[in-house]
């Protein structure tokens, strides 16, 4: 087979994978994340279940692909927001990134449940699928280290403990928002509006001691 023929087959296969993942998202939006089934996805696409197995051998494989795609989208949203920011101030960049994060989560609740909640019994993302999430954590660690280097934070802020606290207070508020007011806008959200206050608390907790050189 010519390279052009192989390219067409590869492209068509990727298009079918995207169609499957899109159908899975639509079904989970309507019926719940944990209720996904391969037969329902096949019906949605007008396929026979055996044909679907050529692309995904199990529904856990679909969850895995969606976890990876969601983690990639989530990271892109944060990076693009910071890249477009007209400031170098660490705390302002924090607000911008957290705003982008929370908006993305509210606009993509299915991905958010896969990434941040244990909604699917028995599902664990593969190392490949989890890699973009680890890259996002490394982005955050570097950001917090920049805050340390600029004298805004103590060194402990950029440790595993600091990362755990930061992600807990930010993702925790977004989780509360999605659980209690899933249809609210970002501007009207009772919990996400507390994100700037939560970040202030983080910076106050890890603030350098007065009079101490950093």
Q: Which residues fall in each region the model found?
A:
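N-terminal intrinsically disordered/low-complexity leader segments
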Residues: 1-15, 82, 210-214
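Short hydrophobic clusters on alpha-helical segments that form packing/core surfaces
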Residues: 20-28, 36, 70, 101, ...
């Amino acid at each position: 087979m010519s390279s052009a023929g192989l390219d067409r087959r590869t492209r068509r296969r990727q298009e079918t994978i995207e169609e499957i993942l899109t159908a899975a998202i639509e079904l989970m939006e309507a019926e719940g994340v944990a209720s996904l089934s391969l037969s329902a996805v096949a019906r949605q696409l007008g396929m026979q279940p055996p044909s679907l197995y050529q692309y995904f051998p199990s529904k856990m494989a679909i969850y895995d692909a969606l976890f990876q795609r969601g983690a990639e989208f989530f990271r892109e949203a944060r990076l693009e927001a910071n890249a477009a920011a007209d400031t170098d101030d660490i705390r302002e960049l924090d607000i911008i990134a957290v705003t982008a994060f929370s908006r993305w989560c509210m606009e993509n609740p299915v991905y958010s449940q896969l990434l941040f909640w244990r909604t699917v019994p028995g599902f664990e993302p593969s190392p490949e699928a989890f890699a973009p999430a680890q890259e996002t954590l490394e982005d955050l660690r570097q950001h917090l280290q920049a805050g340390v280097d600029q004298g805004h934070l103590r060194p402990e802020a950029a440790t595993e403990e600091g990362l755990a606290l930061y992600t807990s207070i930010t993702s925790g508020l977004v989780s509360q928002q999605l659980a209690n007011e899933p249809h609210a806008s970002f501007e009207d959200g009772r919990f996400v509006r507390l994100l700037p206050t939560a970040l202030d608390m983080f910076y106050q907790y890890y603030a350098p001691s007065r009079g101490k050189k950093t």
